């Protein structure tokens, strides 16, 4: 029954995120907000909303280790698992010359996350700084996408537009829009509660840590919106969108959600996460370097298969309770 409730939690959570995105997009359109801004804010928030709500719920429920595992695990899964699957569907190329700037921000944010974690704690001051970086990045992204920054626009705005147009079934009246938003938040709340309660029970029944459940099962589940968005983008051959979804979501997870966790309550960092999982996370980001700078023309099926193999090795390392990155490398 626990597993049924866990799966039900995933379904309700993802359904809530979908309803929230559709309702929020409709609400934004009613205020004549451009598709560009909608795509860069509402859609980006929608794909990361499961991580956000699950992490907040876990933190206030007294299991912050599950929240931490969810965030770090999602960032690893987004790159190795989701880009791996997307690359198998269609070779992913970074054609947008400005996308490397987002990769630099992600690398900086990931490095800052590790530095802040060296004292095994993300506190209020760390949270303030991360949220400040998030706000600056959002303002910069808007100015770049709107063409206010010369030579740094998005190239074309079909990326955000195509995501907005993809939402064909939209609430038509303001009442339905409010209902969609309300039901979306309700679905996120109920789904996250089911995920956390049953995820913790499963962890305890197998005598494994809550952070391990967060790094694997919960992380993969909350990354499903990114899988759907990047998978569809790869199928439609919109390769920049596949890269952009992952990089943007990972930035949001670190500077947005981790920052918020620091503001709500200090986030404790277990030694194993600091000595192993965070290094896997930053190494995954570095793996994107040759693709972002176009030293390698694209993430084809060979590299996609390598990404998936690395993710399987990472899951194996968690299952065998590898304590740090040096043990992992020596055992390969």
How would you label these PLM feature ranges?
Residues 1-332:
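Hydrophobic alpha-helical segments, chiefly the membrane-spanning helices
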